[in-house]
Amino acid sequence: GLCLASQLLTGLFLAMHYTSDIATAFSSVAHICRDVNYGWLIRNMHANGASFFFICIYLHIGRGLYYGSYLYKETWNIGVVLLLLVMMTAFVGYV
């Protein structure tokens, strides 16, 4: 939960300073890293937090495989749907 909360907060702070215009997108990222107080830290926390979040998800899936939780079909299918939703959300956030 803490990892997801930090992703939401850092993403919100980054979105406050980011512009998606094709001419100024790179400049806004440079502005975040150079001019915003601790902008470089917020950007790194957001990027590395996403990787850590997926590592935690994969460890959780591995634990479920190890203990045979895939035998509970309904629960396992809900987990697969949640994994796909998280992956789609991360892709949309990346693009």
From Swiss-Prot:
UniProt binding sites for heme b b566: 60
Cofactor(s) for this UniProt protein: heme b
Regions crossing the membrane: 1-16, 40-61, 76-95
One Pfam family recorded for the sequence: Cytochrome_B
Compartments, record wording: Mitochondrion inner membrane
Keyword presence, Heme: yes
Gene Ontology biological process terms, A to Z: mitochondrial electron transport, ubiquinol to cytochrome c
Record-listed heme b b562 binding positions: 46
The entry's keywords: Electron transport, Heme, Iron, Membrane, Metal-binding, Mitochondrion, Mitochondrion inner membrane, Respiratory chain, Transmembrane, Transmembrane helix, Transport, Ubiquinone
Cofactor note: Binds 2 heme b groups non-covalently.
GO cellular component: mitochondrial inner membrane
InterPro entries membership: Cyt_b/b6_N (IPR005797), Cytb/b6-like_sf (IPR027387), Di-haem_cyt_TM (IPR016174)
GO-annotated molecular function: metal ion binding; ubiquinol-cytochrome-c reductase activity
Role played: Component of the ubiquinol-cytochrome c reductase complex (complex III or cytochrome b-c1 complex) that is part of the mitochondrial respiratory chain. The b-c1 complex mediates electron transfer from ubiquinol to cytochrome c. Contributes to the generation of a proton gradient across the mitochondrial membrane that is then used for ATP synthesis.
Subunit record text: The cytochrome bc1 complex contains 3 respiratory subunits (MT-CYB, CYC1 and UQCRFS1), 2 core proteins (UQCRC1 and UQCRC2) and probably 6 low-molecular weight proteins.
Further comment found in the protein's record: Heme 1 (or BL or b562) is low-potential and absorbs at about 562 nm, and heme 2 (or BH or b566) is high-potential and absorbs at about 566 nm.
Protein name: Cytochrome b
Lineage: Eukaryota, Metazoa, Chordata, Craniata, Vertebrata
